[in-house]
């Protein structure tokens, strides 16, 4: 974007990012930096809801010239409500990768359609390939 072109406001971006799905975490987001996560697979659904842990991913979306970089991580969302970087068990890899891929395509499409902005993977992002 040129210096004379104004990008979308934080509030317009938040509105469109929220519409993608339940992934945006508003309290952890701020102008120019947006936080997303996805609890893809429950570790043990026999436990009571407040003690459940999940396999999934989280991502920091950071504003750069002309768009955003997406830095993804994978791991476990523990019962304390914190993400822990951890290798996924083989039985959940397909589902976690699917939720990330589906979300990422929606993110790309939304930012391109509404704001003509691009999304690229951060150099330190987890590689879902």
From Swiss-Prot:
Chain spans, region Essential for activity: 99-123
GO biological process: positive regulation of DNA-templated transcription
Full protein name: Sigma factor-binding protein Crl
Subcellular location: Cytoplasm
Family membership noted in the UniProt record: Belongs to the Crl family.
UniProt KW keywords: Activator, Cytoplasm, Transcription, Transcription regulation
Gene behind this protein: crl
Superkingdom of the source species: Bacteria
Organism: Vibrio parahaemolyticus serotype O3:K6 (strain RIMD 2210633)
NCBIfam families (alphabetical): PRK10984.1
Task of the protein: Binds to the sigma-S subunit of RNA polymerase, activating expression of sigma-S-regulated genes. Stimulates RNA polymerase holoenzyme formation and may bind to several other sigma factors, such as sigma-70 and sigma-32.
Recorded GO CC terms: cytoplasm
